[in-house]
Amino acid sequence: IFVDSKAQKTDGYQLSKAILLDETSEFNAKPELEIYADDVKCSHGSASGSLNEDSIFYLMSRGLNYHQSKELLINGFLLDVVEKITDNEIRNLIKNIIGLKE
């Protein structure tokens, strides 16, 4: 987050999220907030964890296998971010690169 000295009354939040897919996975969050204004509300947060086994169990009880369940949860996590990209060309390019349907 960058807040110029003229950007008073700015409200900003930076969030880093990650899914840890195996025992060797690591997630290093490094928030970067450059704030040059006095009257602002800016903060940051970080969250990480493995896939929810209850969610995998639920999807498997609905007919998906373990791999399909895991893939569906990961794609949902990725789509949450990708869908916020406003440029259609860039959004579709990223979807194509990570194998998500348009």
Predicted regions and their residues:
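Active-site gating/interface segments in enzymes
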Residues: 1-102
